[in-house]
């Protein structure tokens, strides 16, 4: 079981996403279920180490946002074309 700590995004848009990536974080979104979509920011290095394992894409993950645990599955992962960097992940509530 993977547990990822996340923070709610305060800013959105291209410039805000670029600033996140420069700070070694990246944007993600949690959607699905009856709740509204939630934009979050994740630590790049921690998630990069987790996503190397195949289970990251098939098992239910736990994302902790403001002390609240959300069960999710990775739906879509966007990567940089040639650098080993994650650009964005879509999570769907499990």
Swiss-Prot record:
Domain of life from the UniProt record: Bacteria
Listed transmembrane segments: none
Classification via SUPFAM superfamilies: Ribosomal protein L25-like
Keywords noted in UniProt: Ribonucleoprotein, Ribosomal protein, RNA-binding, rRNA-binding
UniProt GO molecular function: 5S rRNA binding; structural constituent of ribosome
Any Gene Ontology biological process: translation
Cellular compartments per GO CC: cytosolic large ribosomal subunit
Function field: This is one of the proteins that binds to the 5S RNA in the ribosome where it forms part of the central protuberance.
Entry similarity comment: Belongs to the bacterial ribosomal protein bL25 family.
Assembly and binders: Part of the 50S ribosomal subunit; part of the 5S rRNA/L5/L18/L25 subcomplex. Contacts the 5S rRNA. Binds to the 5S rRNA independently of L5 and L18.
Protein's name according to its UniProt entry: Large ribosomal subunit protein bL25
Origin species: Escherichia coli O45:K1 (strain S88 / ExPEC)
Gene name per UniProt: rplY
């Amino acid at each position: 079981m993977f547990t990822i700590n996340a923070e709610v995004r305060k800013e959105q848009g291209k410039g805000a996403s670029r600033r996140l990536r420069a700070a070694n974080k990246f944007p993600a979104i949690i959607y699905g279920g009856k709740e509204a979509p939630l934009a979050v920011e994740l630590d790049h290095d921690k998630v990069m180490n987790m996503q190397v394992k195949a289970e990251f894409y098939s098992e239910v993950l736990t994302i902790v946002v403001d002390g609240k645990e959300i069960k999710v599955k990775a739906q879509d992962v966007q990567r940089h074309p040639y650098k080993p960097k994650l650009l964005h992940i879509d999570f769907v509530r499990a």
